């Protein structure tokens, strides 16, 4: 069985991500320090809360440098995806810088609520193993106030008062702005695709 490291980033979604993986036949290893990453074939970075708090927690756990050196597939979920980028407007905080781009606050408008909360459509942009067998018009469940504008690494977008990156992949570095663990069959398929993607 593939060794999956699930980083305890302090978010409320940790248990639901673990349960989603268990439904796929995977018992993840909860990780609180660098030693926990040893031998992992896949790494998952979930996150709920604020970017400054999450980066401080990763620093306190001694996980920033190990994540920067990581060679195996990594996926960030929700805030975890935002942390993969260079900088977040939330608290004006530097992030991991594993992917080029900056996290911006969503702009509210009369018909656009922030936070963006609920089901919304995934709009594929280019081929990616993460999207294998995900049907056209699939929806995912979002809860966020910040997002990454479209980048060259984006493989799917979402429209909420403007387009933003919903799924990102650059080599083995991946992210989902939505919550796959709360996105029914679509989310389960994307998690399975991540677990099964080529590690090279």
Swiss-Prot record:
<dbReference type="GO" id="GO:0000107">
    <property type="term" value="F:imidazoleglycerol-phosphate synthase activity"/>
</dbReference>
<dbReference type="GO" id="GO:0004359">
    <property type="term" value="F:glutaminase activity"/>
</dbReference>
<feature type="active site">
    <location>
        <position position="179"/>
    </location>
</feature>
<keyword id="KW-0963">Cytoplasm</keyword>
<keyword id="KW-0315">Glutamine amidotransferase</keyword>
<comment type="pathway">
    <text>Amino-acid biosynthesis; L-histidine biosynthesis; L-histidine from 5-phospho-alpha-D-ribose 1-diphosphate: step 5/9.</text>
</comment>
<keyword id="KW-0028">Amino-acid biosynthesis</keyword>
<feature type="active site">
    <location>
        <position position="181"/>
    </location>
</feature>
<comment type="subunit">
    <text>Heterodimer of HisH and HisF.</text>
</comment>
<dbReference type="InterPro" id="IPR010139">
    <property type="entry name" value="Imidazole-glycPsynth_HisH"/>
</dbReference>
<dbReference type="InterPro" id="IPR029062">
    <property type="entry name" value="Class_I_gatase-like"/>
</dbReference>
<keyword id="KW-0368">Histidine biosynthesis</keyword>
<keyword id="KW-0378">Hydrolase</keyword>
<feature type="active site" description="Nucleophile">
    <location>
        <position position="78"/>
    </location>
</feature>
<dbReference type="Pfam" id="PF00117">
    <property type="entry name" value="GATase"/>
</dbReference>
<protein>
    <recommendedName>
        <fullName>Imidazole glycerol phosphate synthase subunit HisH</fullName>
        <ecNumber>4.3.2.10</ecNumber>
        <ecNumber>3.5.1.2</ecNumber>
    </recommendedName>
</protein>
<comment type="function">
    <text>IGPS catalyzes the conversion of PRFAR and glutamine to IGP, AICAR and glutamate. The HisH subunit catalyzes the hydrolysis of glutamine to glutamate and ammonia as part of the synthesis of IGP and AICAR. The resulting ammonia molecule is channeled to the active site of HisF.</text>
</comment>
<dbReference type="GO" id="GO:0016829">
    <property type="term" value="F:lyase activity"/>
</dbReference>
<dbReference type="GO" id="GO:0000105">
    <property type="term" value="P:L-histidine biosynthetic process"/>
</dbReference>
<dbReference type="InterPro" id="IPR017926">
    <property type="entry name" value="GATASE"/>
</dbReference>
<feature type="domain" description="Glutamine amidotransferase type-1">
    <location>
        <begin position="3"/>
        <end position="200"/>
    </location>
</feature>
<keyword id="KW-0456">Lyase</keyword>
<dbReference type="GO" id="GO:0005737">
    <property type="term" value="C:cytoplasm"/>
</dbReference>
């Amino acid at each position: 069985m593939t060794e999956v490291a699930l980083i305890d980033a302090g978010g409320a979604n940790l248990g639901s991500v673990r349960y989603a993986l268990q439904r796929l036949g995977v018992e993840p290893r909860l990780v609180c320090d660098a030693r926990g990453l040893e031998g992992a074939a896949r790494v998952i970075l979930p996150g709920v809360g604020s970017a400054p708090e999450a980066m401080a927690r990763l620093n306190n756990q001694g996980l920033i440098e190990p994540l920067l050196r990581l060679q195996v597939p990594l996926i960030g979920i929700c805030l975890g995806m935002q942390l993969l980028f260079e900088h977040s407007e939330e608290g004006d905080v530097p992030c991991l810088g594993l992917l080029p781009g900056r996290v911006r606050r969503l702009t509210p408008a009369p018909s656009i609520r922030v936070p963006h909360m609920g089901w919304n459509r995934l709009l594929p942009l280019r081929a990616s193993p993460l999207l294998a067998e995900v049907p056209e018009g699939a929806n995912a469940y979002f809860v966020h106030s910040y997002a990454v504008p479209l980048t060259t690494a984006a493989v799917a977008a979402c429209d909420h008062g403007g387009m933003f990156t919903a799924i990102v992949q650059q080599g083995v570095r991946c992210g989902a702005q939505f919550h796959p663990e709360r996105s029914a069959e679509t989310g389960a398929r994307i998690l399975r695709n991540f677990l099964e993607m080529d590690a090279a």
